Amino acid sequence: MRLIAVLGYSDGRTNALHPVCAARLARAESEVRPGDAVLLSGWARRRTSSPEADLMARAWTSPAGRVILDRSARSTVGNALGVARAARRVGAHEVVLVTSGWHGRRASALARAALFHSRTKVTLATTDEPATSAARLRELACWTLLPVMAVLAARTR
């Protein structure tokens, strides 16, 4: 079984599905096959808004064997840990990680670390929207912490 894991995105300015998140969801829908499990991951940035996972679930239109919502993931590390938990729960032999191109390498490194000691393959499926200056700066800062975060992800089960 494959797990299609869609990582949420929000800038916290709206209660609606962010266009970056919508693009990730569309990419996931193009990847899904009958029998795949789908993980929609993302939290609510404000108390008055819906979690990204719920917004994606409402917009999801493709058939999937099972749709799992992870409303607790607040960071890429949280996403990776949720992906690993879901992959173990459904017995996935492959995880297709769906995110933005500018986020993909770091997200897949953390997912692989979280799945350390498993035989689960991680494949990356990305969208091609350009990164904002803020996103590029955040990615650069997060890359400096990647070794520590990867060890944390590998040790957390």
Where are these regions (language model features)?
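Actinobacteria-biased recognition of intrinsically disordered, low-complexity terminal regions
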Residues: 1, 156-157
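A transmembrane-helix-recognition feature enriched in membrane-embedded lipid enzymes
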Residues: 132-156
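A structural signal for short, hydrophobic/glycine-enriched beta-strand patches
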Residues: 1-136
